[in-house]
Amino acid sequence: MPNRRRRKLSTAMSAVAALAVASPCAYFLVYESTETTERPEHHEFKQAAVLTDLPGELMSALSQGLSQFGINIPPVPSLTGSGDASTGLTGPGLTSPGLTSPGLTSPGLTDPALTSPGLTPTLPGSLAAPGTTLAPTPGVGANPALTNPALTSPTGATPGLTSPTGLDPALGGANEIPITTPVGLDPGADGTYPILGDPTLGTIPSSPATTSTGGGGLVNDVMQVANELGASQAIDLLKGVLMPSIMQAVQNGGAAAPAASPPVPPIPAAAAVPPTDPITVPVA
């Protein structure tokens, strides 16, 4: 008898324990099944630096460093990418000719004779009637100078046809040498070192391995270095070197101001010599 009671008690305790363990699991399963879908989370991604961002990063670092000293750099359109883009929206005739010239799509709107030939005026004999032709006028349309040499203009009599050498400011003399380009200065076309380079030479590659975005200059050299180091490393290197160098240059410029030299003492005036009376010598 006691064994039966113990079995029943153990069975009841086992059932209660199983229910206590299974009830939370069942609750979470039912809750997850009845819960609506979660809202998608929006993550902000930052675009990695690329090689094309190097000129913009360089100009922004320069503008931030120079703005502290009151120097503002104007924006450069070629670096910001704000080029003039021509689309077909400004000129409808380029994309849809029918919007500007209806005669191209519907010829009957402009010339009724193309659709209804009977509308054109037909007068039989008006153009081909005999006797209606005009007699030719002798001499009309002919150049008298071709038959009479005396009517032609002599050579040099018309000053408006030619300009003597030296009278036209736009034309130089025969032996004149232009002095706009200094001799011996090779960095640029006009003797200056270009900063942004020549945009007309942008399609010429500097080497088979690397290509440049300009025709030479400081930015072109920086772009070539960036191709070798990588965009991110080059930007970090410029930011780490550019700002300290600017601050150090400004501090050295202020500290290197020469001190004022002491004033030169005035030269003392020479002592005045008293005048001497002439010696009178008696004459014998």
Curated annotation (Swiss-Prot):
The keyword Transmembrane applies. Residues 92-121 are annotated as: 6 X 5 AA tandem repeats of P-[GA]-L-T-S. It is a single-pass type I membrane protein. Sequence repeats lie at residues 92-96, 97-101, 102-106, 107-111, 112-116, 117-121, 144-148, 149-153, 154-158, 159-163, 164-168, 169-173. It holds the Pfam family GLTT. Residues 1-22 form the signal peptide. Residues 86-110, 202-212 have a biased composition (Low complexity). Residues 80-216 are annotated as: Disordered. It is found in: Cell membrane. It comes from the Bacteria. Residues 145-165 have a biased composition (Polar residues). InterPro entries: XGLTT_repeat. Keywords: Cell membrane, Membrane, Repeat, Signal, Transmembrane, Transmembrane helix. Residues 144-173 are annotated as: 6 X 5 AA approximate tandem repeats of P-[ATG]-[LG]-X-X. The keyword Transcription regulation does not apply. Residues 274-284 are cytoplasmic. One of its GO terms (cellular component) is plasma membrane. Residues 23-252 are extracellular. The chain crosses the membrane at residues 253-273. To M.leprae 28 kDa antigen. Surface-exposed protein required for multiplication and intracellular growth. This is Exported repetitive protein. It comes from Mycobacterium tuberculosis (strain ATCC 25618 / H37Rv). The gene is erp.
